[in-house]
A protein has these predicted regions:
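Active-site SXXK
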Residues: 98, 115-140, 164, 220-224, ...
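A short acidic/small-residue loop/turn micro-motif
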Residues: 106-110, 114, 362-365
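Non-transmembrane alpha-helical segments in soluble domains
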Residues: 130, 145, 162-165, 198, ...
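Active-site-proximal alpha-helical segments within enzyme catalytic domains
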Residues: 216-223, 266-289, 344-360
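Active-site Gly/Thr loop motif
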Residues: 247-255, 305-355
Length: 386
């Protein structure tokens, strides 16, 4: 028995040493916050495992959502409640005409709980690009090489900012959420996102294929750092969060120690309350304006929520815009969706003047018209209460 224990201990030591020698030591942090907690991969409640975050302070003029006339009366049906529970829903919020229609929490969450956005924040990074466009710092029709010179050679030279916004860069980052050695795991858990990006270049003519990858969002964040001082958290804090009257601080996970120049993980790890996530939906609903004040260039927001196939004839993708998912209901109502790994979503439905937020620990795998079928069910649940 002693020899078996000794051999096991030696093997463990060798594995640890190898992980550090090959720059895969990030795996141990990932294992600690996923497998050792009984999850296959990252979860919405992983904030305690973030060693470095930037704070986005609550607004100095907080604007709570007012109760609408149906608030407290509008409830999901028993069947809908069962469905929400089956996918481990943590919060469900419905807003119409700028007022609360329904708000509910479960699994220990409440109106003050901060949860991980995962990919919902890709849309926020796009909004930050929109801020730069409005300031004349970025032209989305320009090439990436204009801002990041390493893309000046070969086919890279034709890659545009718009193509990166639309996930059609043809840069082979990879987007596996189960491969612990893949690009996405390194981007989520390892330090040094910018170093991770450096070797990647296009491997086919840019613009000719839609491929959803967080690496594109990381490139957009790097572009922003090339054209302005400050960082993503400051962009959101000073130009959106304050003006939208956010009631709570948000936190954004960093890829290392800020003293060493760490940057936000621009594709995930934005932690906010459900009510404050809804503000991004309202901002989109009002085409980049908040209570009459234009925060993001209106034309940019209009293009952001326009399907790819209406802005280019290179790719016939109708369910994606600028870092945001798009669709329409069975009866023809267009909507946009900020959507994350665990089925978190901020849905904006202009025809109903409504915003719906759902957070949770799981989602279904089925798809319909390029989107998770859960999105359509969430919309149906919300509409039943309007």
């Amino acid at each position: 028995m002693k020899s078996i224990a000794r051999a096991t201990g030696l093997l463990a030591l060798v594995l640890v040493l190898l992980s550090f020698l090959t720059n895969h030591d990030y795996l141990w942090g990932g294992i600690r916050e996923t497998w050792l907690r009984g999850w296959e991969n990252a979860q919405i409640d992983d904030l305690p495992y973030r060693d470095h975050v930037r704070s986005i302070p609550a607004s100095s003029n907080p604007q709570p959502w007012p109760d609408g006339p149906r608030f407290g009366k509008a409830q999901p049906s028993p069947e809908d409640l069962q469905w929400l529970e089956s996918w481990k829903t943590a919060s469900f919020l419905v807003i119409q005409h700028d007022s609360l229609v329904h708000e509910s929490y479960s699994r220990g969450h409440d109106a003050t709980t901060l949860t991980n956005s995962f990919s919902m924040v890709k849309s926020v990074t796009a909004m930050a690009v929109g801020l730069a466009v409005g300031q004349g710092l970025v032209d989305e029709q320009e090439t990436m090489a204009t801002y990041l010179p390493r893309f000046a050679e070969g086919e890279n030279a034709s890659l545009t900012v718009q193509q990166v916004l639309q996930m059609r860069s043809n840069i082979p980052f990879g987007e596996s959420y189960k491969d612990p050695f893949g690009f996405q795991a390194k981007a989520y858990y390892r330090e040094g996102n910018r170093a991770l990006l450096q070797p990647y270049r296009v491997d086919a003519t840019p613009g000719t294929k839609f491929q959803y990858q967080g690496g594109n969002t990381m490139l957009l964040a790097e572009l922003l750092d090339a054209v302005r001082d400050g960082n993503l958290s400051q962009d959101v804090a000073g130009q959106l969060w304050e003006q939208m009257g956010a009631e709570h601080d948000a936190l954004w996970g960093l890829d290392g120690d800020p003293a060493d120049g760490a940057v936000e993980r621009s594709f995930a790890q934005f932690y906010a309350t459900t009510r404050d996530f809804a503000r991004f939906g309202q901002l989109l609903l009002d085409t980049g304006a908040w209570k009459g004040q234009q925060l993001i260039d209106r034309g940019f927001v209009e293009r952001m929520i326009t399907p790819i196939d209406r802005l280019t004839d290179e790719v016939d993708t109708f369910w994606y815009g600028y870092q945001i998912w798009l669709g329409s209901t069975e009866d023809g109502m267009p909507f946009s969706v900020m959507e994350g790994l665990r089925g978190q979503m901020v849905v904006t439905i202009p025809a109903l003047d409504a915003v719906v937020v759902r957070t949770g620990y799981d989602k279904g795998k089925a798809k319909k018209r390029g989107l998770p079928t859960d999105v359509f069910r969430v919309i149906d649940v919300a509409r039943s209460m309007l």
